[in-house]
Amino acid sequence: MPFAQVNGQKIFYKDSGGRGPAVVLAHGFLMDSSMFDAQVAALSDKFRVVTWDERGFGQTEHDGKPFTYWDSANDCLALMTHLGVDSAVVGGMSQGGFLSLRAALTAPQRVRALVLIDTAADVDSPEILAGYKQMVDTWVTHGPVDDLVNIIANIIIADPVENPKWIAKWKARQKELMVHPSDCLLNRDDVSSRLGEITCPAIVIHGTNDNAISAERAEALRKGLRNAEPIVWVDGAAHAANLTHPHVVNPPLRAFLERVA
């Protein structure tokens, strides 16, 4: 299994290899690098696609300390360095997008373009944060009980085939592993006022049924970026459009990468 020892973390990653332009993709909260398997399959003939597990998720061994999405952005950049990648198209879904924006702000010379899937630059409303905190408290106290994981699966995935696969993964997790990743999510900073600093090309992809991040927030993200293309709306997709609707996501994603990578 490929691991990179960076920033005190043992980061699990998958690298399609090859000499094509590098594309580094980061997963959403409660997900892992496998959520991009369909994108790797669709892109790796022409691109070097790297996917990785963020702190607290998948096979990455987290040091157990608190962290922020700025730390996760630095993990991404350090992984690129470990792999000998000077610059890449960087992107992700939901929290993968949060860290990708921060990577572009941290090291603009290393981020050639951004892929932003079902994500935002701002923070959640107090009402939404309160709901998420209640879910997290239930998980940490009682574990991933059926009612809770079914609700979460329908928010993130909402797919009859994929839901049970991810619920099984969640039930296998130690409940204590939720503490620091959820603190990172719930206490993240708002970077929307800094979007104008990002000058690289960007593509925003968003599910029309995404109830975690609204269409209005996706529009605000696109408008705040100086070089973003029109939003690719994924009809019927919830919060993980690339996972549930790869047949819709992959063609415009590949076309974008061919233009900018």
What is each residue range found by the language model?
Residues 124-130, 142-196:
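Conserved alpha/beta-hydrolase catalytic His-Asp/Glu region
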Residues 209-213:
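Acidic catalytic loop of the alpha/beta-hydrolase fold
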Residues 70-88:
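Conserved acidic catalytic loop of the alpha/beta-hydrolase fold
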Residues 219-240:
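Catalytic histidine neighborhood in serine/cysteine hydrolases
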Residues 101-106, 112-142:
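Flexible "cap/lid" loop of the alpha/beta hydrolase fold
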Residues 9-65:
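Conserved HGGG/HGGXW glycine-rich cap/lid loop of the alpha/beta-hydrolase fold
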Residues 198, 204-206:
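Short beta-strand/loop motif that positions the catalytic acidic residue
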Residues 237-250:
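Catalytic histidine-centered segment of alpha/beta-hydrolase-like enzymes
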